[in-house]
Amino acid sequence: MTIMRKNHPLLKLVNSSFIDLPTPSNISSWWNFGSLLGVCLIMQILTGLFLAMHYTSDTATAFSSVTHICRDVNYGWLIRYLHANGASMFFICMFIHVGRGIYYGSYMLSETWNIGIILLLTTMATAFVGYVLPWGQMSFWGATVITNLLSAIPYIGTTLVEWIWGGFSVDKATLTRFFAFHFILPFIITAFVLVHLLFLHETGSNNPSGLNSDSDKIPFHPYYTIKDLLGVLLLLMVLMILVLFFPDVLGDPDNYTPANPLNTPAHIKPEWYFLFAYAILRSIPNKLGGVLALILSILVLALFPLINSSKQHGLVYRPITQTIYWIFIANLLILTWIGGQPVEYPFTTIGQIASIMYFSIIIIFMPMASMIENDILKLHY
């Protein structure tokens, strides 16, 4: 079996990726989130597939079909809530994964990092089009507001929006194409995941010390397979508590009202995992400026490998940058909170300050702190 595992054309790919992969011996539980994201992706594809068997992408029947899934399909309620809350778990894992990458300097593996940013954007797109499918009030108005942002693009904006809508408003054509996008995008994500892993295995994993670990590697199996399995069990436990006890805690009550183009909800807001970006969008009074800030809030991550001036890998031995990093995380939480609040004083002002802080920390304060630390340690080589 050992020979077959190492020589078989298909099995040797699995072997070199998950069994005999040389892995740093000191990677902590923060490195578990990659495998958890893989589990989330597989779970989302499977639950989504079963939901697609019963869902109809037609404005007249979409809302009813979701109700039918929850009421009449065997364990349909379970599949539906696993899918909805699974998306939340997916984003929690993804945010932690990115946060770990920033903390431990994993962005220096630039190809892996850039594919990761593409993955984040694609996942956000998938979640957005998926949120439209139940055809509740927040689905409809979320789709209307967010797609309408494209009209801020000079000259071609309005034409582009109507082209995406397939008409003059969000309607049957929009819902049908969003369902098509929502079905195909997870498979595109899976392809990007394979490229992400390909680039990661070219260089090998980073580790908490930030030092070269070539002299201290252990095989992935059994050490990290068992460690990842523990992570998966904890993830599933949290997910099942969410699904079975608090299935609607992360959703919006407005989405239990069928979509009505004649009645606007009091507060239009996206799912919790988009609130930080939504707060940044709203903090700029100009439409085009807001759209650019929204896009840059994710694309700014691509600057990390370029503006890193530290002579050390990661923040483990850099107390000044560490402090700034945790301020950045707190700032993100403030943005998430503001994104869910109404557009009025003092929330607008707090949102504007937090948005300025978000970009300033990444572009100004972190590089400055790195230079100060280099100077303190006299690392001028």
Curated annotation (Swiss-Prot):
Component of the ubiquinol-cytochrome c reductase complex (complex III or cytochrome b-c1 complex) that is part of the mitochondrial respiratory chain. The b-c1 complex mediates electron transfer from ubiquinol to cytochrome c. Contributes to the generation of a proton gradient across the mitochondrial membrane that is then used for ATP synthesis. It comes from the Eukaryota. The cytochrome bc1 complex contains 11 subunits: 3 respiratory subunits (MT-CYB, CYC1 and UQCRFS1), 2 core proteins (UQCRC1 and UQCRC2) and 6 low-molecular weight proteins (UQCRH/QCR6, UQCRB/QCR7, UQCRQ/QCR8, UQCR10/QCR9, UQCR11/QCR10 and a cleavage product of UQCRFS1). This cytochrome bc1 complex then forms a dimer. One of its GO terms (cellular component) is mitochondrial inner membrane. Heme 1 (or BL or b562) is low-potential and absorbs at about 562 nm, and heme 2 (or BH or b566) is high-potential and absorbs at about 566 nm. Binds 2 heme b groups non-covalently. This is Cytochrome b. It is found in: Mitochondrion inner membrane. Belongs to the cytochrome b family. Heme b b566 binds at residues 97, 196. Signal peptide: none annotated. Keywords: Electron transport, Heme, Iron, Membrane, Metal-binding, Mitochondrion, Mitochondrion inner membrane, Respiratory chain, Transmembrane, Transmembrane helix, Transport, Ubiquinone. Heme b b562 binds at residues 83, 182. It comes from Phyllotis limatus. It is a multi-pass membrane protein. Its main location: mitochondrion. One of its GO terms (molecular function) is ubiquinol-cytochrome-c reductase activity. Pfam families: Cytochrom_B_C (PF00032), Cytochrome_B (PF00033). A ubiquinone binds at residue 201. PROSITE patterns: CYTB_CTER, CYTB_NTER.
